[in-house]
Amino acid sequence: MRFMIFNGSLKKSELSNTYAVCELVAAEFKKQGSETRIVTMNEINYECGTNDYNDELKPIILDFLKNYNGMIFATPIWWGLHSGYISSVIERFDYIDSWSRDNKFYPNYNKVFGSVVSGGGDGFQHIHGNFLNFATQLGFTIPPRATVEAKTQGKENIIKDAELAQEIERFCRQMTVYAALIKGGNPSQFAQHQQTDK
């Protein structure tokens, strides 16, 4: 299986707790036989908004749609909210949602979704809830317990956190198992693509 992680950290990778958690997730996926691509949003040039812009993000989204089995949002908590970088990814996928409605085909029916939140404050459930609502509306399947909360601060401490490692192992297993089930079942072939609200 192949998974794409959109890393919404506000800091550069070498300074980012969120990126450190993304690396642990990628390493665990590799251990379980899956591939991972981490896209760090603050390191690419792209437009914010809901249009089909020709920028560095567009080929990444197209690569995801064509070649990946699952998507993961990774974000720090900032004042109880997810980062603006992840908001910009959600905005850009709005175009995919509009295309899906117009063409009566949801490419994400064959994909799973999970989310990773890092930070020491409250807000995990609120952020996961927003992400999971977005994902189900775009046709993703959400495996049980497909979320990670990383409260530990500092890269060295994150790497040593045994409880976090257990949580990541479970997260990756759930994502991999359900991605394989969905790929085999091919819901894009059989699921309802026509909107009933039109």
What are these model-derived regions, one by one?
Residues 13, 122-123, 153:
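A short beta-to-alpha transition loop/helix N-cap that caps and shapes the active-site region
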